[in-house]
Regions:
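Glycine-rich loop/hinge motif
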Residues: 13
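Acidic/polar surface patches and capping/hinge elements
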Residues: 1-9
């Protein structure tokens, strides 16, 4: 039996102030090419982000597995990957489910208990699993 899922790589900038988050988002969105937007996000994350876990890695939050039915007892070995911030994880999963988030497009600001997140899905990989 096989199952399909996909993984996304997320980068973000975390700031304390919504106005700053809005300015960062606007700055990134003004770059016409996707690769340029990713580079700008990485540069701005290194300069402005207060996220100690991702700041020095261009805002990289790692890979998130999505599209897998969590109630399926045949879950992937090791469980499901999840973002450490539940508010951001919920936002990402809901946005992907509703198809409002897309690779290369800037999202946010997303408010969480840590502050305001501006981010982007930078890469995605579709997977087929044999169970």
């Amino acid at each position: 039996m096989a199952g399909a899922t996909h993984q996304i790589q997320i980068r973000h900038i975390l700031v304390e102030n919504k106005e700053v988050a809005d300015l960062l988002k606007e700055t990134i969105e003004n770059i016409p090419a996707e690769a340029g937007r990713v580079k700008m996000l990485m540069k701005l994350a290194g300069k402005y982000s207060i996220c100690s876990a991702s700041k020095d890695d261009g805002g990289n939050l790692g890979w998130l597995e999505v599209g897998w039915n969590k109630s399926d007892p045949r879950q992937p070995r090791g469980g499901f990957s999840k973002l450490n911030n539940d508010d951001l994880d919920d936002f990402m999963r809901e946005g992907l489910e509703k198809m409002t988030l897309h690779k290369g497009r800037v999202f946010g600001p997303v408010e969480s208990y840590e502050g305001f997140h501006v981010g982007m899905i930078c890469q995605e990989v579709k997977l087929d699993r044999i169970l």
